[in-house]
Amino acid sequence: MAELSGNFLYAAFLVYLIAVPIFGGAIRGNKDKKGRPNRWANIGITLSIVGFFCHLGYFITRWAASGHAPVSNMFEFTTAFGMMLVLAFIILYFLYRLPSLGLFTLSIALLLIAYASMFPTDISPLIPSLQSNWLYIHVTTAALGQAILAISFVAGVIFLLKHVDQTKPSKKTFWLEAIMFILVTTVAFIAITSAFRLAGYEAEFNWVDKSKEKSVMVYEMPALVGPHQGELLTEGRMEPLVDLPALFSGRKVNTVIWSFGAGLVLYGALRLIIRKRISALLHPLVKNVNLDLVDEVGYRAVSIGFPIFTLGALIFAMIWAQLAWTRFWGWDPKEVWALITFLFYAAYLHLRLSRGWHGEKSAWLAVIGFAIIMFNLIFVNLVLAGLHSYA
C-alpha cells in the first residue's frame, strides 16, 4: 500500500508537470467566440483535476498504510498542503476562468511536492501525544486554510508581474525579484539535496540538546555549522566552522545555509543567461490578464481562507492543546506564528474593506502573508525547537 501511495504521488507530479506548459499555451492563445477560455485551458484544467485525484489517491492510500492521517511529518504535511492548493485552484478556476492562475499555482504545487520529497518518506508510528482524532481535524483544516490563502499569493504575484514597471529598476522591481530569488533558491535546495543524497554523504555528530541530553545527529551535507557542543564521529568529513546554540537544529540551519548559497549561484547563472530580471522574463505571460479580476481572485481567496485557517490553526489547535497538554496556549513558536498569521490577514481584510487598499497594495499584502506562512512552515518547523517541530 505504501508503494502504491508513492506511485500515486509520482503520477500526480507528472500530470501537473504536463499541465503547466499547457496552461502557458492557453495564456498565449485566444478565447473562443463567446469569450470563454480556449481548448488549451480546458485541457489544462482537465489535467489538473486528473492530477488532483492522483494526489488524493496518494493521500488515501498512505492513510490506509499508516493507520493515521498523513500529516505527521514534513513530507506528509507539505504534500498534503500541495494537494489542497491544487483543490483550491480548481474551485477558483471554475469561478473565474483564469488560465494564468493555473500556470503559477501548479508550478508552486510542483515545487511543494519536490521540496517534500527531500525529507524522509518512511511511514512511522505516531508518538502518543499525536494519537488523537484532533490530529487530522486540526492539521488538515489549517492546511486547507493556508492553501486557499496561498492562492491570494499567486494572484498577487500575477498582479505585480503585470502592474510593476519592468523598464527601470525601483524598490518594487527589487522586491518582486526577491520573490523570484526565493523560488530559485527552493529549486537550488532540491538540486543540492538530491546531489548530496546521490553521493551518499553522511556525517555523524554527538551533541547536547537544550535539555542537556546527549544524542547523535546525522548531517547529509558538509557541516558549515555544527550542533551544540558537537563532536564529529565520522572520519574524513568536514569539521564545522562554528557550533550553534541548543535552541537551533544545527543540521537544518546548515541545510538552509547551503540552500541559500546554491540559490545565489543558480540565480546568478540564470541572470547571466537571460540578461534580464526573472520577473521581466515572466511579464509577457501576464500581459493580457485583467488586473481587476486578478485583484478580485486574491481578495476572495483571503476572505474564504482566513476563517478556515482561524478555525484549524487557532480554535481546533487550542482545543487539542487543552486535551493533550491541559492548557489552551503555551507560546510555542508554532503557536506564536499561527497567531501572527491570523493577525496579519485580519489586518489585510481591515485595510482592504475599511481603508480601500485594493490593487497593488492588496497584492503586496498577499505576498507578505504567504511569506509568513512559508516562514512558519519552513523556519519554525525545521529550525526552531518546539512541540510542533518536525523531525
Swiss-Prot record:
It comes from the Bacteria. One of its GO terms (biological process) is cytochrome complex assembly. It is a multi-pass membrane protein. It holds the Pfam family Cytochrom_C_asm. The keyword Magnesium does not apply. One of its GO terms (molecular function) is heme binding. Keywords: Cell membrane, Cytochrome c-type biogenesis, Membrane, Transmembrane, Transmembrane helix. Disruption phenotype: Cells lacking this gene exhibit a lack of cytochromes c but normal contents of cytochrome a and b. Can sporulate. The chain crosses the membrane at residues 7-27, 40-60, 75-95, 101-121, 141-161, 173-193, 254-274, 301-321, 328-348, 364-384. GO terms for cellular component: membrane raft; plasma membrane. It is found in: Cell membrane; Membrane raft. InterPro entries: Cyt_c_assembly, Cyt_c_biogenesis_CcsA, Cyt_c_biogenesis_CcsA/CcmC. Interacts with FloT. Belongs to the CcmF/CycK/Ccl1/NrfE/CcsA family. Required for the biogenesis of c-type cytochromes. This is Cytochrome c biogenesis protein ResC. The gene is resC.
